[in-house]
Amino acid sequence: ANKKNLDKKFFIISKNLSIYEKDFLNKINLRFVVLCENLYISQINTAGIPDHKKRTLILDINFNEKYFERVIHHEVFHIIHNNFENIFNEEIWSDFNDKTFEYAECSTCSDRLGLDLYNKTNGFLTEYSKSIASEDMAEVFSFLMTDKIKMKNIASKDSILFNKIEFIKNGIKKIKNF
C-alpha cells in the first residue's frame, strides 16, 4: 500500500471512529479494524465488510474517496444491526416505506448500487438504500453520522425519511442506555 494513502485513510478512520464512545463500541462488540485494498464480495468491489464473528470491520482504503467517511459509519451500522436485530427490526423498518415498494432479495443480487444522495429522496437517500432494508438503515445511519444538518433538512420535507431517522436515533439511544 502507498504509505501516503494509508496514513491519510488511517487518520480519516481514527477521526470518524473517535465520534463513538468506547463504551458504545464495546456494547456493539466492535474490537478490530482491518485495512485492506481491492476488497470484493460476490465479484463486486466493496468498501467494507463487517465480520461479526471476529468483531472486526474490514475497510478498503482504495474505495472511492468521495464516500469513504460515510462508508465507515455505514459498516459500523452493520455491526450494530447484527448485534441488535431486535431493536432494528427490518419488518418495522419496511413498513415506513410506500406500500408499493419492495426491497430486493439480497444486496448483491440487486443492481441498485448508487451511493450519491438523491435530489428527490421519496423515502430513500441513495439508490443503494433501495437494495435491502439493512442497507437502507446503514445508509440513513451513515448520513446521520456525517451530515446531521442535511438530514434534518431532508426529514423536514420527507415524512418517510423523518420516520426512518427517528427510528435509527431511538434505536441508538436504547443501545447507549442498554
Question: What are these model-derived regions, one by one?
Answer:
Residues A1-K4, M151-N153:
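Charged, low-complexity surface segments at secondary-structure and domain boundaries
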Residues N2-N29:
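Zn2+-dependent metallopeptidase catalytic core
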Residues I28-F178:
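Active-site-flanking segments in enzyme catalytic domains
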